[in-house]
């Protein structure tokens, strides 16, 4: 695995000898990582002509050098002024000459260094395009990012190249495609090694600074969630996304190398047994035509629903404005709270309206035989059932896809839609599954450190300074394993901590229990296995003691459970009995029982939550920042 993993290491160029510039595949431009993620940081490419594209991260404008002003003319002293006056006049002339000369040198230095006086806001006459006064000419200095790397490229643009007004060209988020020549910075103190002197602007995609949410100062992550379609343009979310991509590639790399076959499993399923699930139906909203419909209730306490909706729209617009402005968080929070109360009022009016019209259909009254699929269907919460059928033929299989849980919980660790990597292995028992989880987890930690080092350095500075040390320690050590019974005993010995849920045998381990175990006692990831059968799913294999089942959780500090796994029940009689004990309809599991009727075999598997893994790898505190478009209870913005 080591030799194979090395072939995938270092996505950027770390060779000592600089390579020639190559165009981005399927594009007529050069990716910035090709220029900047080299051993020489691009210095060896000076003089090369390239086309680059990206979005403006910062911008400044410097007025072009104008001719030096003429020396001041001072009248000669009159003969009657006396010697003292003549001496004073001579001193003034000398001082002014020195100041004038120093101003010339200062302007010359500004041109060479790219510094000088900046003009982020332009005169009204220039913006209005008045012809009476010729607009001043500027040199623009942009920092451009194209998302291929943590690094940005400085692009120098003469204002004469652009037909777009200066304020629009310089707005944060503007997309620019430029052709020019790479050069070494003129300023010796420049932080960057290479820059592009633009000769052509091939494309300018402007933004409206008044409406673009990223136009203002850096927004915190929790506020960026309202603009999930724009937040990947921020440096932090861009780095997190590249780490996410690396974890995905690492998962395929590890599993393919170890002989797992990739299988697609359905998102729509008839199988239940995984907690609250989303129902799939086309019947909601349909009513009996014979049912008398009463006129809707339009008002509550003198407020019409249309009026309330108009107020909601205005309050939403105000909150958007506050978020883009420099308003403090307390003001924004107060406005959001006020909007919530208005939304609650609208909900009350609509609920009363629906209760009066008699058009609301309850799910239990629906005839699902008339539904699209002719029966109850749900969004899947796990793909392991379907993987079992392929493991019974191919031996080792895996899948990667969305999983849906309808728990009405809104906190930093819950999502309604998550993405899981799931495996299933025939001829494997619980210890085999734990070994697989152990090696897979450590491989992910090592892969991220070796292949996304620049992003990890940035995230370490911006989010969590301990992530690199934590991942290095995890990748190089063996994970400790404890039975559930041993964990309960450890928790009961904790004399300095009082738990809200008393640790007793048979009680499900809570977040505070797991946090104490990983953050306080062992300060690292651990595996907890052999749980009481009452707190795990019915399909997990029953142990010989008839009290425990063959399940495990891989738990990490600050995050909680990242990987779950189990050896599933292969014995028909026991599985059939446990389905009945759990209160499920046997009919829904006939296909699953068939796998035990015909050619049954011992098998086990694991399920990794990609979002939880990303939290551990980056130190992010909230799972809603670990997925591109978060869906949680009450929130689905786009």
From Swiss-Prot:
Q: Which protein is depicted?
A: Asparagine--tRNA ligase, cytoplasmic 2
Catalysed reactions, as listed in the record? tRNA(Asn) + L-asparagine + ATP = L-asparaginyl-tRNA(Asn) + AMP + diphosphate + H(+)
MF (Gene Ontology): asparagine-tRNA ligase activity; ATP binding
Per the record, the domain of life is: Eukaryota
Pfam families, per this entry?
A: tRNA-synt_2
Q: Which family does it belong to?
A: Belongs to the class-II aminoacyl-tRNA synthetase family.
Where does this protein reside within or beyond the cell? Cytoplasm, Cytosol
What are the alphabetically sorted keywords of the record?
A: Aminoacyl-tRNA synthetase, ATP-binding, Cytoplasm, Ligase, Nucleotide-binding, Protein biosynthesis
Q: Does the keyword Cytoplasm apply?
A: yes
Q: What is its EC number?
A: 6.1.1.22
CDD domains attached to this UniProt entry: EcAsnRS_like_N (cd04318)
Keyword tRNA processing applies: no
Give the source species: Arabidopsis thaliana (Mouse-ear cress)
* Composition bias, Basic and acidic residues: 1-16
The biological process GO terms on file are:
asparaginyl-tRNA aminoacylation
Question: Per the record, GO CC terms?
Answer: chloroplast; cytosol; mitochondrion
According to the UniProt record, where is the region Disordered? 1-23, 62-87
